[in-house]
C-alpha cells in the first residue's frame, strides 16, 4: 500500500492518486463537543509540505465517496484504503466514546450513503492515544444500532503513538478488538528514525500469536529509506512522494517480491508468503 500523506482537501485526492498512491491518509480535527469538524493538519507539518490545506469533514467525505464509488465520474479504481488520522489530542479522555459515535454517524451518512452504494474503500481509524480506545466502541456500537454492522467489515484500527507493542495489545484487549489491526511506526520526514520498533511490530505480525495484521512506516520520502523499509518487510509506506515508492517497487530487487495492492487484497489478512 502506497499511502499518500496528509491529503486534506478534495483536490488532493486526485493529485495523490495520480502520483501513484493507492491509499491516502487524512487528518481529522474535532470541535469541543467531539464532532469531527475539519480535515486539517496545521503547522508544523512535514518539511516541504503546505500544512494548511483543509476541507469541512462532511464535504471531504462526500468527495471521498465519489472517488471510491464505481461508476462515478470522479472514481479512482486504485484508491482502496483510507487512514483517518484522528486528532483526538484536543479532546478529554471521557469524550472518546462520543467522538467514535459522531464519527460513525457522519461516515454512515456521507461516505457509506446509509449503506446504499456508498464508497467502497477500506477505512483505518488511527488513534494517537491509547487512553482513547473507547472511540472504537463508540464507532462500533453506533453502526450496530443503526443497523449497519456489516460495514464494520470495512473498518480497521491503528494506534499511532509509537507506544510499546505490549501496551498497544492491552489497549486492543480493553477495546475488544481481535483483528483488522494495522500498526504504524514513524516520525515526521524532518527527523530520522530507525527501524527497530518497525521490526518489533513485524515480528508480532509474523508470530501467529500477535494482534497485528499489517505494518506501515511513515513518513518516507527517500529511496534509501524506502528500500530499508521494504527489506524489513513492511506492508505499507506513507509518503509525500508516491512516485518515489512506486519507482523503488519497480526495481529488480523488489518487483518480484512486492506488488501494489488492489481491491482484491484483503487489508485485514496477515500476508503469508
From Swiss-Prot:
Disulfide cross-links: 45-51, 47-190
Keyword check for Magnesium: yes
- Where in the sequence is the active site? 5, 41 (nucleophile)
Subcellular localization(s) per the UniProt record: Secreted
State whether keyword Transit peptide applies: no
Q: What reaction(s) does this enzyme catalyze?
A: an N-(acyl)-sphingosylphosphocholine = an N-(acyl)-sphingosyl-1,3-cyclic phosphate + choline; an N-(acyl)-sphingosylphosphoethanolamine = an N-(acyl)-sphingosyl-1,3-cyclic phosphate + ethanolamine; a 1-acyl-sn-glycero-3-phosphocholine = a 1-acyl-sn-glycero-2,3-cyclic phosphate + choline; a 1-acyl-sn-glycero-3-phosphoethanolamine = a 1-acyl-sn-glycero-2,3-cyclic phosphate + ethanolamine
Tissue distribution: Expressed by the venom gland.
Listed cofactors: Mg(2+)
Quote the cellular component terms of the Gene Ontology held in the record: extracellular region
Binding residues for Mg(2+): 25, 27, 85
Q: Which BP terms in the Gene Ontology apply to this protein?
A: killing of cells of another organism; lipid catabolic process
Main localization, broad class = secreted
Quote the record's cofactor note.
Binds 1 Mg(2+) ion per subunit.
User: What is the protein name for this chain?
Assistant: Dermonecrotic toxin LruSicTox-alphaIC1b
Amino acid at each position: 500500500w502506497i499511502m499518500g500523506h496528509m491529503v486534506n482537501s478534495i483536490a488532493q485526492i486526485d493529485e495523490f492518486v495520480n502520483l501513484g498512491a493507492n491509499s491516502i491518509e487524512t487528518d481529522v480535527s474535532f470541535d469541543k463537543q467531539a464532532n469531527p469538524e475539519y480535515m486539517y493538519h496545521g503547522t508544523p507539518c512535514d518539511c516541504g509540505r503546505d500544512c494548511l490545506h483543509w476541507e469541512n469533514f462532511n464535504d471531504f467525505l462526500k468527495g471521498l465517496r465519489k472517488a471510491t464509488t464505481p461508476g462515478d465520474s470522479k472514481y479512482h479504481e486504485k484508491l482502496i484504503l483510507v487512514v483517518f488520522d484522528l486528532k483526538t489530542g484536543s479532546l478529554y479522555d471521557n469524550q472518546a466514546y462520543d467522538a467514535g459515535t459522531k464519527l460513525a454517524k457522519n461516515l454512515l451518512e456521507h461516505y457509506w450513503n446509509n449503506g446504499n452504494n456508498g464508497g467502497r474503500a477500506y477505512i483505518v481509524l488511527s488513534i494517537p492515544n491509547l487512553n482513547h480506545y473507547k472511540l472504537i466502541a463508540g464507532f462500533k456500537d453506533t453502526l450496530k444500532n443503526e443497523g449497519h454492522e456489516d460495514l464494520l467489515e470495512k473498518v480497521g484500527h491503528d494506534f499511532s503513538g509509537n507506544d510499546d507493542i505490549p501496551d498497544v495489545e492491552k489497549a486492543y484487549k480493553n477495546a475488544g478488538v481481535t483483528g483488522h489491526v494495522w500498526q504504524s511506526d514513524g516520525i515526521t520526514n524532518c527527523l530520522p528514525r530507525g527501524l527497530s520498533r518497525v521490526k518489533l511490530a513485524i515480528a508480532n505480525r509474523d508470530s501467529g500469536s500477535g494482534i497485528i495484521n499489517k505494518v506501515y512506516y511513515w513518513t518516507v520520502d527517500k529511496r534509501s529509506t524506502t528500500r530499508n523499509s521494504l527489506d524489513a518487510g513492511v506492508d505499507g509506506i506513507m509518503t509525500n512522494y508516491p512516485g518515489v515508492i512506486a519507482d523503488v517497487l519497480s526495481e529488480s530487487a523488489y518487483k518480484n517480491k512486492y506488488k501494489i495492492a488492489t481491491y482484491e487484497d484483503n487489508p485485514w489478512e496477515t500476508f503469508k508468503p
